[in-house]
A protein has these predicted regions:
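Residues lining hydrophobic/aromatic ligand-binding pockets adjacent to catalytic sites
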Residues: 1-120
């Protein structure tokens, strides 16, 4: 299974495979048609409190990563996502979509690390 991340505002591509939005909130100004999302897994997104605390501040990213990973460990929605990805098959590509402008310091990057570390 190949897992990638991509800004939801970038154009959809057949190379994206299964497109999964991992934001709790729908991306501003983006129609459902243009987003071309297969699945919206908002329950695996960081809690509202953690998202607000982080505020996409790169200086807080290491702490954010640790706190978000802890949330994921305690979140039953992550198991559903892992199972879904597993059932897609090893040859399928999955693209985790996020709305943040920072392509490095965001929840999708942490979620990808988490899923990769669990061999999904």
């Amino acid at each position: 299974m190949r897992i990638c991340i991509k800004r939801v505002y970038e154009a959809a591509s057949p190379d994206d495979g299964e497109r999964i939005l991992v934001d709790r909130l729908w991306p501003r100004g983006l129609s459902k048609e243009k987003a071309a999302i297969d699945i919206w897994e908002k329950d695996v997104a960081p809690s509202a409190a953690l998202r607000k605390w982080f505020g996409h501040d790169p200086d807080k990213f290491d702490d954010f990563r640790n706190k978000y990973r802890k949330e994921l460990e305690d979140n039953p929605a992550i198991k559903r996502l892992e199972d879904m990805i597993h059932h897609l098959g090893k040859d399928k590509k999955v693209t985790l979509l996020f709305g943040a402008k920072d392509e490095t310091h965001n929840q999708a990057a942490v979620l990808k690390e988490y899923l990769d570390s669990n061999d999904n």
